Amino acid sequence: MRVSIITETWPPDVNGVAFTVHGLAHGLAARGHSVQVVRPRQPGIIAQEDAVATLAVRGAALPRYPGLRFGLPCGGRLRREWSGMHPDAVYIATEGPLGCSAMNAAKHLQIPVCTGFHTRFDDYVGHYGLGWLTPIATAHLRRFHNRAAATLVPTRELANELSQLGIGNTRLLRRAVDTRLFHPSRRDATLREPWGVGDNDPVVIYVGRIAPEKNLGLAVRAFRKLQSRLPGARYVWVGDGPARAALAAHNPDFIFAGTQLGEDLARHYASADLFAFPSLTETFGNVTLEAMASGLAVVAFDQGAAHEHIANGISGMRVPADEPQAFISAAFALGVDDVLRGAVRQNARIAVAALAPETVVAEFESLLKRLTQENSSGNPALAARI
């Protein structure tokens, strides 16, 4: 197949969408497909993708996240590009101006389109004092995704939520986790030493954007309760974002490791003991899978990855979304009970063992083939290329 993937975020951007889309693109290429990635040009970075073709378009900085960019409209360029390339399918991962241009161009050229639902922007805007934009964002998401032949979602729970928003024709595509990279064997005593913890002192870790929409105040409260029982406990924060400065100013004992990638990120996960993830705005939460693969005891709200992959009390703790006190209690229980935490850590890795990237890419390939077949009955040339 010839597949064009449109995304407004791509490595070296550090977020779950960028990593997920990068894995899907390179996974398809490894299976012999011709893959084009359309994304905003990243200043100072030369596109060097051996396995996939890159079409870099104009972009602009995202407000409050200067390191991230969104693509500007480029419908005419995409129509010209695809008129020559003739992609069998288009996958649009993001709903910004670039994604909208891609949708219009694909529809104009009668190319089958599917979308991915990665971010609840309708939830995010309220955390930045823009709650009045919520109905506008919801209407945009509904209109955008309903133009696609299918919208790919990582959980049945999200499919049900989107159905309530009026977004139909969702199909399940699980998220992958690299269990070879994220592994308990990467635990590193030399990394823990500067954290000032002994062998038996629990380390709580947070990985992700340090931003208002992540509900970080609850994580702080949960840690302080644990620390009141275990003064040697430490809280390590991996990532960056607009809330970091204030968080550090109010919590001088917290350890901020900055952005970590690859094996360094895996070492940080494995060198901790408990992953407390307080976010209520995730469509999935890839970091939950990474923490579980690393053998951490996870406490999270009962949604996204936690809902899908945590057996409560066995491979982690998941609590109702409207019960912040239950989150604090669950984190405390996992932190103070060494036996419980040890059992949960072993079971956590087992729970995600089947989510290998190769398996998920094969599922993505199958979905794209089905999409093209459903649209090729009147186009024998298209069917012959599949």
What are these regions (language model features)?
Residues 41, 157, 176:
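Carbohydrate-associated surface elements
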Residues 82, 145, 259-260, 267-272, ...:
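Short alpha-helical donor nucleotide-sugar binding micro-motif in glycosyltransferases
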Residues 197-224:
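Conserved donor-binding/catalytic core segment of Leloir-type glycosyltransferases
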Residues 244-264:
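Nucleotide-activated donor-binding/catalytic signature segment of Leloir-type glycosyltransferases, i.e.
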Residues 280:
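Aromatic "clamp/platform" in nucleotide-sugar-dependent glycosyltransferases that forms part
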Residues 297-300, 310:
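Short hydrophobic beta-strand element within catalytic cores of glycosyltransferases
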Residues 312-313, 317-324, 333-338, 353:
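Conserved acidic donor-binding segment of nucleotide-sugar-dependent glycosyltransferases
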Residues 326, 340-354:
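A short, well-ordered alpha-helix in the C-terminal region of glycosyltransferases
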